[in-house]
A protein has these predicted regions:
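Transmembrane beta-barrel wall of Gram-negative outer-membrane proteins
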Residues: 2-77, 100-120
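Face-selective signature of the C-terminal outer-membrane beta-barrel domain
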Residues: 110-133, 156-271
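Structural signature of Gram-negative outer-membrane beta-barrels, strongest in the C-terminal barrel
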Residues: 51, 55-57, 164, 183-195, ...
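Membrane-embedded beta-barrel scaffold of Gram-negative outer-membrane proteins
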Residues: 7, 12, 115-129, 133-139, ...
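Short loop/turn motifs that connect adjacent beta-strands in outer-membrane beta-barrel proteins
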Residues: 15-25, 59-60, 119-121, 178-186, ...
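Gram-negative outer-membrane beta-barrel transporters
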Residues: 351-353, 366-448
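Conserved C-terminal beta-signal and adjacent last beta-strands/turns
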Residues: 162, 186, 331, 409-516
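Surface-exposed loop/turn segments flanking beta-strands in extracellular/periplasmic regions
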Residues: 81-94, 145-154, 200-232, 279-281, ...
């Protein structure tokens, strides 16, 4: 779409082995700058990334630390609207937002991992992860549309001072021991997680007329406005403390059992307003068991089954009412297989039951009572010949809101993909060639919680060609990628009849990579 991208990746040791605190220290530094014209009516995307990492290890201890910083700006595109209850391909490129509608901010992530081996049987592992996204959103919101005349009512909204963060710390003891003549892989540990979502100034402008989607004139709606005191300073915070015990037991050469128990204590508070008013202050604890069996029917075929329970506090900054935590149960059974020469795959059937599932309509998040997903999944990957490799998947999913007996929004009953890569050399031309391509299938989906319209299914085709050679002393790679090769118009998701996402058109990129 008229853009450019530059990347670098530097990796190497810092000192000789054993010189740094008796161990080996290495670094990696990656960076990227990407800017492009937005593919719809107007707008521009920009991303600047820098990511340093350090790794140190000796005979018994390893330490890994990585950090990533991203400065980004992107159009706040709410997609298209329904015209007489249908999706109109003529509006594929046409936006109803103003040019100032965009989201800009800074994303940061930090990850650390420390592991120490006491013996061949026992080791301890500690991890810490932190992520934060600070951003502002300027939004053109569609509030009503007249399909006959094209008149679109809009408002100028904004969410300023957004600050969403998540941090998680774990500490665990891992052991591989023999007890009662059976091999055990044991894990005992603890976990702490904190999630926080905050929205500062909340601006909700008045709905205004004067814009026609069929003959748009931009610049009639100004950004900004006065913050709504009652809706500003929205905050939701969750603290969760967990203790985990798990054991994988090799009962016989063919039979393996896995059992685990997690106890989680959680605290949640949320509210909004100036002055701040608490809407929810709740706490509780939950036991989450899991159990599984795997049996090797043959060296190439293994049957398995497992059952587990799940728990997740719901965090959102704009809610209709305090959000209760989500509880779930998963039942799964299947077969893992391997075929010659080097093909592996998994066939699984499952049922997932959840209650208090968070759904968002417009910008407002609430929960539905109970949801159930039943399905079949098949994944296959491997080397067909010396030159040809493939990866494919298919899933049948029957997902419903059990209270209303309606399909879940944006969940397709049929999805699948198939991609192949051919790796070869061409006579009289030094280097290697790789050619690949494939397709993704997504079936029809419900477009909103009321099931008032359906998003059509689609097939999207991608392809690439790559050439690897050496120029001078430097390994060099040229790669041409084409996404949505057939330039198919498709709609990946929707939120309402006024917010329907539009898939990107054909995108061609040429990348050159030089290693030194």
């Amino acid at each position: 779409h008229g853009g450019s991208n530059a990347q670098f990746d530097l990796t190497g040791p810092l000192g000789k082995p054993g010189q740094v605190a008796g161990g080996t220290l290495a670094f990696r530094l990656t960076g990227e700058y990407d800017t492009s014209r937005y593919w719809r009516s107007f707008g521009r995307e920009r991303n600047a990334l820098i990511a340093p990492a350090l790794s140190w290890h000796d005979a018994n201890t390893s330490i890994d630390v990585s950090y990533q910083y991203v400065d980004y700006t992107m159009p706040f595109d709410r997609g298209t609207v329904l015209v007489n209850g249908q999706l109109d391909e003529a509006l594929r490129y046409r936006r109803y937002e103003e040019a100032w509608s965009q989201s800009s901010g800074i994303q940061e992530t930090l990850r650390t991992r420390i592991e120490h081996r006491f013996s061949d049987a026992w080791r301890v592992r500690a991890t810490y992860g932190w992520g934060r996204d600070r951003y502002d959103q300027f939004i053109t919101r569609a509030t009503a549309f007249n399909s006959r005349t094209g008149a679109l009512t809009r408002s100028s909204d904004a969410n300023l001072g957004r600050n969403d963060s998540d941090q998680i710390a774990t500490l665990g003891l891992l052991g591989n021991v023999t007890l009662a003549g059976m091999q055990h892989a044991i894990y005992v540990g603890g976990e702490y997680e904190r999630q926080r979502s905050f929205r500062g100034d909340t601006i909700r402008g008045k709905a205004t007329t004067g814009f026609n989607l069929y003959d748009p004139v931009y610049g009639l709606l100004a950004p900004g406005g006065m913050a709504n005191a009652k809706q500003s300073d929205s905050r939701s915070v969750v603290h969760a403390y967990s203790t985990i015990v798990q054991d994988s037991v090799k009962i016989t050469d063919r039979l393996t059992a896995v059992g685990g128990l997690r106890w989680e204590n959680w605290q949640q508070e949320s509210g909004m307003g100036r002055p701040f008013v608490f809407a929810d202050r709740s706490r509780g604890s939950v036991w989450l068991p899991q159990f599984g069996l795997a049996y090797a029917l043959t060296p190439a075929l293994t049957a398995y089954a497992n059952v587990s329970r799940s728990f997740k506090p719901n965090v959102a900054s704009n809610v209709a009412a305090p959000l209760a935590p989500e509880y779930g149960r998963v039942l799964e059974a299947g077969l893992k297989f391997s075929l010659k020469p080097a093909i592996t795959g998994t066939l699984a059937v499952y049922q997932i039951d959840k209650r208090n599932v968070a759904v968002t309509v417009g910008d407002l998040t609430s929960t539905i009572g109970t949801a159930r997903s039943r399905g079949i999944e098949l994944d296959v990957a491997g080397q067909i010949t010396r030159h040809l490799s493939v990866i494919g998947s298919y899933a049948y999913t029957n997902a419903n809101d059990r209270d209303s007996n309606t399909p879940l929004v944006n969940v397709a009953r049929h999805t699948g993909s198939l991609f192949a890569v051919y790796d070869t050399a061409i006579a009289n031309l030094p280097g290697r060639w790789r050619f690949g391509g494939g397709a993704r299938l997504v079936g029809a989906r419900s477009g909103d919680t009321a099931n008032s319209f359906t998003l059509p299914g689609y097939v999207s085709v991608d392809a690439f060609a790559a050439y690897e050679t050496t120029i001078g002393k430097f390994p060099t790679r040229f790669q041409l990628n084409v996404k949505n090769l057939l330039d198919k118009t498709y709609y990946p998701s929707s939120n309402s009849n006024l917010i329907v996402a539009v898939g990107e058109p054909r995108l061609v990129t040429l990348t050159t990579t030089v290693s030194f």
